[in-house]
Design a protein with these regions (language model features):
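N-terminal beta-alpha lobe that positions the nucleotide/phosphoryl donor
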Residues: 1-237
Length: 237
């Protein structure tokens, strides 16, 4: 993000406790964000629920709130601090969910707080399984056959259309695949999909055809504002 002279105070959301899908790398990235913004003259307010982190050291931010990472708590802090912007991209899935919730319910507009780093459209398109599938299709990127569902009735209706079992259940807006899994029969499908809908922040699961037996190759790519890109690591599963 280029320097913005119209912004004076920024709230940064931490990632909370270390757990599967959201580990120490977010403490490191959050710490670097605090340092970079303060070095550039911004007033930094950090909200994090985990006191045992580097970013909670007193010199990291102008003010630090060790509070539960919940939308209503973050809103109360912003009402008190009156920041110009909210930075959620350094806090992992938890922070992105909070930012999306505050944007969708109108809280950010009400408080005059701008979401910086990741905009709302990018968060929705990356986390909403149906929107992500449509984005991939629009750019002619091959994807597995899948159907977005928000009820068990829709889940059961998707079985024949997707060619039968096994099927993969992918909840939207969850951390580390929480509530997802592979179903080999109707009973497993209902059980897993019910949990997925329950855990999803928007009550949605994507029912996807299985590609068991395929190899997975993952590339971590960093890209800057000038569209320069570099592959920093590769993985094979």
């Amino acid at each position: 993000m280029p320097r913005r002279d119209d912004l004076k105070k920024v709230v940064i959301l931490g990632s909370g406790p270390i757990r599967i899908g959201q580990a120490a790398e977010f403490d490191f990235s959050g710490s670097q964000a605090c340092r970079a913004l303060r070095a550039d003259g911004y007033e930094v307010v950090l909200v994090n629920s985990n006191p045992a982190t580097i970013q909670n050291d007193p010199e990291m931010a102008d003010r630090i709130y060790i509070e539960p990472l919940l939308p209503e708590v973050v809103k109360r802090i912003m009402e008190l601090e009156k920041p110009d912007a909210l930075l959620a991209g350094m806090g992992g899935q938890t922070a992105l969910n909070i930012a999306a919730a505050l944007a969708h319910d109108g809280s950010l507009d009400e408080l005059g707080v701008e979401l910086i780093g990741c905009n709302l459209t990018a968060i929705d398109e990356a986390e909403d399984r149906d929107l992500f599938k449509k984005v991939c299709e629009e750019i002619d990127l091959p994807v597995c056959k899948a159907i977005a569902c928000d009820s068990i009735e829709q889940v059961l209706a998707s079985v024949d259309e997707l060619g039968g079992f096994p099927l993969l259940i992918r909840p939207a807006f969850t951390l580390g695949g929480l509530g997802g899994g592979t179903a080999y029969n109707t009973g497993e499908l209902v059980e897993i999909a019910s949990q997925g809908i329950l855990h999803s922040a928007i009550g949605q699961v994507l029912i996807e055809e299985s590609i068991l037996g395929w190899q997975e190759h993952e590339y971590e790519v960093m890209r800057d504002g000038a569209d320069n890109a570099i592959i920093v690591c590769t993985m094979e599963n």
